[in-house]
């Protein structure tokens, strides 16, 4: 007999539908799986047989062939266990074939027949259309976020068999709540002093401008960066689904609702490999940190300590908002629309106090050159962060709260969307004159900086985008960008070099 059962596998951060075709025929008992299964799928033969027998069902004493169609593309993971087990029982005559119509099955089987959750249920459920989806109870909430059809959670293979045979109704339990992964957001009011850096955070959030914080150890660069997440608006439905699917595919914890709605914040260690940061791997296409930060903040602390090859791998994703990964038999595109924030010391020794740098010119040049010019050029904001003064540290008066600043950020983003349909960092040079025209005095200021070799052509475009955001943050629609907006944007393009040189426009 023959049976075809719907299921899905994970491919990068996307689900791919798979038809599990099972043929049971006379012959010496055997159990073969074909259709490019990987090692975890081949191992399912033993898991499935033990789970079926532990559930009280009879195992066919015939030749069993399982084909995973379509045969192109390697099938990975243990999520096909449940579909294979149901397919064997249908093809063997234990379950009527009519009972599995318009049903799809995802889940790993334990040897005792228990159903275990697998990573990537959200994108796999999204790939199965409007089919009713049978999943482990631990994956039900995640599946319901994206599934178009009804979700039927189960805890044991026996429950699924009894429901399909009509002996008992579907259990239809309430899904288990997911582990809490949405940690509280640190408040901006906790930052003492740092008026320029606080202003830079607000501008970065309002215009989605990449930002580099330059300062000595203990200046508060990490503290500032962690407050940026709270200034960003909640993700829209489309981006929230994309972020949820990426987190699900990577096996990362999801918030209790099952949907990633708050902008993610990822801070990988500087020893991270290219595969960890960008994504990929030798045997799978696992999302990297830049995809896990999709819709939020990717924070690279001690950015100059990352391997230059790893940093250069960020250039294409930052430009396109997606990561393209190619392997010999695999190709995937992962979402990677992030706000990049880097933090670094001004020199290898840290340069804590003015005139205290002990680094020679050669050491300083090597340190600075670890960040390539093309990557450095992608930072619209380069801000010097000094250690706060004693009076600022001892001041009992809190600064503006995250809620107050986030309201201004949201209003500025609304202005940009109404004007040009996107954030200001996405303005192409051809549209700057239309959407970010300069008043005459602002144009003279920019001209002066260019003539004195303090601003390049590409830097000029970035200054105009930042100035457009600063103008929007005034809270009132402004047709032109004022001189004061350009002056503030120029202040936020610090050079990288000796501490004494920081502050020059570049």
Show the residue positions of the predicted features:
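Peripheral, non-AAA+ core regions of ATP-driven protein-machinery
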Residues: 1-212, 216-219, 223, 326, ...
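Short beta-strand elements
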Residues: 18-24, 277, 380-383
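Proline-centered turn/helix-capping motifs that create local helix->coil transitions or kinks
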Residues: 162-174, 236-237, 249-255, 349, ...
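Short glycine-centered helix-capping/turn motifs at secondary-structure transition points
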Residues: 93-94, 166, 295-296, 321, ...
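Short glycine-/polar-rich loops that comprise or flank the Walker A/P-loop
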Residues: 29, 61, 100-101, 130-131, ...
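Alpha-helical scaffold elements adjacent to nucleotide-binding pockets in ATP/GTP-utilizing enzyme cores
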Residues: 47, 51, 84, 123-127, ...
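Basic, amphipathic alpha-helical bundle interface domains used for macromolecular binding and assembly
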Residues: 34-45, 58-60, 67-77, 285, ...
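Conserved ASCE/P-loop NTPase catalytic core
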Residues: 34, 108, 199-366
């Amino acid at each position: 007999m023959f049976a075809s059962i719907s299921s899905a596998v994970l491919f990068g951060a996307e689900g791919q539908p798979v038809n599990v075709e099972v043929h049971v025929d006379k012959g010496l008992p055997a159990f073969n799986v074909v259709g490019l299964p990987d090692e975890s799928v081949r191992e399912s033969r033993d898991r499935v047989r033990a789970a079926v027998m532990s559930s009280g069902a009879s195992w066919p004493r015939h030749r069993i062939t399982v084909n995973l169609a379509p045969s192109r593309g390697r099938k990975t993971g243990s999520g096909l266990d449940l579909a294979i087990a149901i397919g064997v029982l249908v093809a063997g005559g234990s379950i009527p074939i009519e009972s599995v119509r318009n049903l799809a099955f995802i889940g790993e089987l334990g040897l005792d027949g228990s159903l275990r959750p697998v990573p990537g249920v959200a994108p796999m459920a999204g790939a199965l259309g409007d089919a009713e989806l049978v999943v482990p109870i631990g994956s039900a909430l995640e599946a319901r976020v994206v599934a178009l059809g009804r979700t039927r959670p189960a805890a044991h293979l026996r429950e699924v068999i009894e429901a399909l045979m009509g002996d008992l109704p579907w259990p239809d339990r309430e899904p288990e709540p997911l582990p809490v992964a949405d940690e509280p957001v640190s408040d901006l009011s906790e930052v003492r002093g740092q008026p320029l850096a606080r202003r830079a955070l607000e501008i970065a959030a309002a215009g989605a401008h990449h930002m580099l914080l330059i300062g000595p150890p203990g200046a508060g660069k990490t503290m500032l960066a962690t407050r940026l997440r709270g200034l960003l608006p909640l993700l829209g439905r489309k981006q929230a689904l994309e972020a949820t699917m990426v987190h699900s595919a990577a096996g990362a914890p999801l918030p209790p609702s099952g949907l990633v709605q708050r902008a993610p914040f990822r801070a990988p260690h500087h020893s991270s490999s290219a595969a960890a940061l960008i994504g990929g791997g030798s045997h799978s296409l696992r999302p990297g940190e830049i995809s896990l930060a999709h819709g939020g903040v990717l924070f690279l602390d001690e950015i100059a300590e990352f391997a230059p090859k790893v940093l250069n791998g960020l250039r294409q994703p930052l430009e396109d908002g997606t990561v393209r990964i190619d392997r010999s038999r695999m190709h995937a595109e992962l979402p990677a629309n992030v706000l990049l924030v880097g933090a670094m010391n001004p020199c290898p020794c840290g340069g804590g106090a003015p005139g205290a740098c002990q680094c020679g010119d050669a050491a300083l040049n090597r340190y600075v050159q670890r960040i390539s010019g093309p990557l450095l050029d992608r930072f619209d904001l380069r801000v010097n962060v000094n250690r706060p003064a004693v009076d600022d540290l001892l001041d009992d008066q809190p600064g503006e709260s995250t809620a107050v600043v986030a309201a201004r950020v949201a209003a500025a983003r609304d202005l940009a969307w109404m004007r040009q349909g996107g954030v200001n960092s996405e303005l192409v040079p051809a549209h700057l004159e239309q959407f970010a025209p300069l008043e005459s005095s602002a144009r003279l200021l920019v001209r002066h900086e260019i003539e004195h070799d303090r601003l390049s052509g590409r830097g000029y475009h970035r200054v105009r985008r930042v100035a457009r955001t600063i103008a929007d943050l005034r809270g009132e629609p402004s047709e032109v960008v004022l001189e004061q907006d350009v002056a503030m944007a120029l202040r936020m393009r610090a050079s990288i070099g000796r501490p004494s040189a920081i502050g020059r426009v570049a």
